[in-house]
């Protein structure tokens, strides 16, 4: 008997750094292809998919502003443009394997992509298209995690998935500490007050206020995204 898929609409957040793969900068085509195939498996199972990608593989606003020459506001806008570059790359990868995809930007770039309109985004999803949201919230001082949470709420997602390099949430960095303990479930409050890095406090608070579950999972395990949505144990952690 086939497992029943519980969530019909999800938003998946990928970090820009993940797109760089083993490189320090840019886009690893192999990683891009892997992500595209994982997204395709969701679409083939009648799941409506929204995507947000960070821009850290190109530039981070906070880092750009550290030298004192570039103001933080300008640095953040530069970061927003980086997310649009990643969004267009992901669109190409998805369309290459046959998925109808739209990019919507919080900053108007009409020659490249649509401007973000939540009603239009929902209509695209209902038609089976993948929608990639670029340029963050369109405002400086907000992270792409916050942008992803905001878009997830606006389009009515059942949950937001933060796809990372680890299997879930740990009490400390599993890449540095062999005794790191995986936390399968924790509350919004625990995520806010603890030293556990899930998302920034603004994103978690927004999810809490709107009762949006946050899932953290490993993006590099083949089939893992689909398994997460089926609520199989052992492949993710959840904040709710």
UniProtKB/Swiss-Prot annotation:
GO terms for cellular component: cytosol. Homohexamer. Keywords: ATP-binding, Cytoplasm, Kinase, Nucleotide-binding, Pyrimidine biosynthesis, Transferase. Its main location: cytoplasm. The gene is pyrH. HAMAP family: PyrH_B. It holds the Pfam family AA_kinase. Transmembrane segments: none annotated. It is an enzyme of class 2 (transferase). One of its GO terms (biological process) is 'de novo' CTP biosynthetic process. Inhibited by UTP. It is found in: Cytoplasm. This is Uridylate kinase. ATP binds at residues 13-16, 56, 60, 164, 170, 173. Its EC number is 2.7.4.22. It comes from the Bacteria. InterPro entries: AceGlu_kinase-like_sf (IPR036393), Asp/Glu/Uridylate_kinase (IPR001048), Uridylate_kinase (IPR011817), Uridylate_kinase_bac (IPR015963). Pathway: Pyrimidine metabolism; CTP biosynthesis via de novo pathway; UDP from UMP (UMPK route): step 1/1. Catalyzes the reversible phosphorylation of UMP to UDP. Gene3D superfamilies: Acetylglutamate kinase-like. UMP binds at residues 55, 76, 137-144. Belongs to the UMP kinase family. It catalyses: UMP + ATP = UDP + ADP. SUPFAM superfamilies: Carbamate kinase-like.
